[in-house]
Amino acid sequence: MKVLQVQNIRYGNLLNGLDFDWHQGEIIALMGANGSGKSTLARLIAGLIEPTAGEIRLTIDGTSCNWNTVTRWQEIGLVGQHPRRQTIGATVAEELGYGLLNLGHDIRWVQSRVRELASSVGLGGKEDQSPATLSGGERQRLVTAAILALQPSFLILDEALTMLDARAQAKVLELLFQAQTETGQLWITHDPELARLADRLLVIKNGKLVDMGKPQEGLINSEIESLYGIREFPKKTFSRAQEESQRVLEWKQTKYESRLTLNKVVRAGEFIGIVGPSGSGKTTLLDSAIGFILPTEGQLLVCGKHLSKDGLKTVRRKTRLVLQEAGEYLIGRSVYHEVFYGDQGRDLLAERQARLAFLEGFGISARLAEEAPERLSGGERQKVALAAALRTLPEVLLLDEPLLGLDTMSRASIQTMISAWDDLTILYVTHDLREVLQYADRLWLMENGNVVLDCSIQCWKEHQEQFRVSGVRC
C-alpha cells in the first residue's frame, strides 16, 4: 500500500502549511474558492513546481522513499483544466498509445489497448482523427483515458470532469471507479454533486486545509456555505423579446460541410440556451454566428444582411464570443490592460476608478487588476475574459461554457450580471440546463450537428426525458 504524505507544504503567500495523507485507493475531493491554491497544490504534488517549504513523501508498505528519486510521472498522473495543453499526439490513437509504448509494451498489445480505451470513453471510430478536431469535452476524455492507461498510483483531476456532459461524465467515472483499487484520486472540483462521490472532502481556505471528513456530511456544513457564498440565483425580473422583434440572426437552410445544418431564427433580446452532448456542434454553431466559418450551402443573415467575407468586420463589432476555456487566450500584460486595451490613452483618474468598479462587478479586485493574466487561477482568468467581452456592450453575446472553473459565488455573480443585460441577444452553450433555466427564453437541443429540439422555456419539462437521454444535466 502506497501513501502520499503532504507535510507542512508552503508556497509563497498562497499555501500556508498544508498537511494531509493520501492513500492509494482513496478518492479525495478538494474544494475551495477561485484563487485559493487548488491547482497550485496539484502542480506541487505532480512535481511541476517546488514548494517554498515543507515536503512530500511517498511511503510503500510503511517504508519512506526519497521523494527526489521517485519517478513521479509513473507514480502521479495529472489531468489539468485545459486539455489543449496536454495533447501531443497527431491522432487520438497516438495520444492513447504514446505512454504505453514508452513503457515498453508490445506494439500489437498497445494497438488493441488503444481501441479498448477509445471505445471506453466514447471515442471509438475516431482513432485516426487529430485531437484538434475534437470538442473540448471529447479532448478531456481523451487526456483522462491516456493517463489512466499508464496506471499511476495517484491521479489528480483538476476540474477535469466539469466540461463533460452527463453521459460522458458517467463513462469517465466508471473508468475512475474501476481504477480505484490501485489508484488514489484527487478530484479538484466546484461541483458538490461530484464531491459527494468521494471518500473524503478537503477544503482550502485562507491558505489552510480543512478536513471535512465524509463529503455527504461536510457539504451541509456551514463552513462550505461560508466558503462559497451559496445562495439562490435571483429571479428574472426583466422583459424579454417579443415575437415581432427584429431578426438578429437567421440561418436559412445553411450547411457547414458535414459539421452543422441550421434553419433557425434568433430575435433581438432573446436568450437561447444551447445544450447537447460533447461533439454535437454547439461550439461550431457559435463559430458560425460570428463568422469564423462560412456556410457551404444556404446563407446566414445578420440583422437582415447576408454574411459574407466582406462584412465580417461589421458583424464582429456587434458580436462578442467568449470561448470555451477563454482564460487560455488572454494576451494583455495585466488584467487591466487585457480588459481595457485601446481605451487607455485618456486614462483619467475618474475613468480609471469607474473601470476598477466595473472589474469589481466581476469579482476582480484592484489588486488583481495589476496582475499578469497568467498568474491568475483558471476561474479568475475566466472572469477576466467575460469582463473583456462585456466591456464594449455588444448587441449579440455568444457564451461557450462561460462558468467552467468558477466557484459557486463567482458563478452567481456572473449569472446575475449576464441576466441584467436585457438589451443583449445571448446564445449560451452549456452542458448543464440548470445554468440557464431562470434566464433563457428558448432551449435548443443539439445532436450530430442539428438542432433536434427547439422549445420555449415554459415547456421544457415536457421534454425533460429527451434532454436526459441526450446527456444533458437537468
Name each model-derived stretch:
Residues 46, 290:
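Helix-to-loop junction immediately C-terminal to a conserved catalytic motif
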Residues 63-77, 179, 306-320, 463:
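ABC ATPase NBD coupling module
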Residues 108-126, 350-367:
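Conserved ABC ATPase "signature" region
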Residues 130-134, 138, 372-376, 380:
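Conserved ABC ATPase signature
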Residues 155-159, 397-401:
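Catalytic Walker B motif of ABC-type/P-loop ATPase nucleotide-binding domains
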Residues 182-189, 424-429:
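Conserved H-loop
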Residues 208-230, 450-473:
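Conserved beta-strand-loop-alpha-helix hinge in the C-terminal portion
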